[in-house]
């Protein structure tokens, strides 16, 4: 009897925490969110030069087997980036409507085409510009950089 009561209380607690959003079930977007963070978020730096791109692309494991042709690093706090997910939905390049846009500080890294993995070489361009990100989940989190 006491064991059944304990199970009931634990179930009630879990449902309450789920309702409050304190415990989140994983639907696969957690892995996509972590990948987005690894590939695109670097709030501590402003970037802007070729050396930065060469180092960060290697550190973030985007040069292991081939040189990723293009990547953007966002130099904003993750909460600022996540707030983009609360803006009006727009259409993504793939036709879905889970994209959102905002203006952020970025460094765009473009492969020079004259090197081979893992020693890839990049050209950097720092700017403040409009970006488009795809968001999923509840609460919504960025899972894909769309442009």
UniProtKB/Swiss-Prot annotation:
Q: Which residues bind dUMP?
A: 35, 40, 68, 71-72, 145
| GO BP term (any one) | antibacterial humoral response
A Pfam family this chain is assigned to: RnaseA
**Which keywords fit this entry according to its UniProt record?**
Antibiotic, Antimicrobial, Disulfide bond, Endonuclease, Hydrolase, Nuclease, Pyrrolidone carboxylic acid, Secreted, Signal
Alphabetical list of InterPro entries matching this protein = RNaseA, RNaseA-like_dom_sf, RNaseA_AS, RNaseA_domain
Nuclease as a keyword of this entry, yes or no, is: yes
The positions flagged as active site in the entry are 40, 144
Which cysteines are disulphide-bonded? Answer: 53-109, 67-120, 85-135, 92-99
Which SMART domains does the record associate with it? Answer: RNAse_Pc
Q: EC?
A: 3.1.27.-
- Endpoints of the signal sequence: 1-28
Q: Which domain of life is it from?
A: Eukaryota
Instruction: Name the PROSITE patterns on file.
Output: RNASE_PANCREATIC
Q: Which residues form a coiled coil?
A: none
GO MF annotation terms: endonuclease activity; nucleic acid binding; RNA nuclease activity
Q: Per the annotation, which location comes first and is thus the protein's main one?
A: secreted
- State its role: Cleaves preferentially after uridine bases. Has antimicrobial activity against uropathogenic E.coli (UPEC). Probably contributes to urinary tract sterility.
Q: Which family does it belong to?
A: Belongs to the pancreatic ribonuclease family.
What is this protein called in UniProt? Ribonuclease 4
């Amino acid at each position: 009897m006491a064991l059944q009561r304990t199970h009931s209380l634990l179930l009630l607690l879990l449902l309450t925490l789920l309702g409050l959003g304190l415990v989140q079930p994983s639907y696969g977007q957690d892995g996509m969110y972590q990948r987005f963070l690894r590939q695109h978020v670097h709030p501590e730096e402003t970037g802007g030069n070729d050396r930065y791109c060469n180092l960060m692309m290697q550190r973030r494991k985007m040069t292991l087997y081939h040189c990723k042709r293009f990547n953007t690093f966002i130099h904003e706090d993750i909460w600022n980036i996540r707030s983009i997910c609360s803006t009006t939905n727009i259409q993504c390049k793939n036709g879905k409507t889970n994209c959102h846009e905002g203006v952020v500080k970025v460094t765009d890294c473009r492969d020079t085409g004259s090197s081979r993995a893992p020693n890839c070489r990049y050209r950097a361009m720092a700017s403040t510009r409009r970006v488009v990100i795809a968001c999923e989940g509840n609460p919504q989190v960025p899972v894909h950089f769309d442009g």
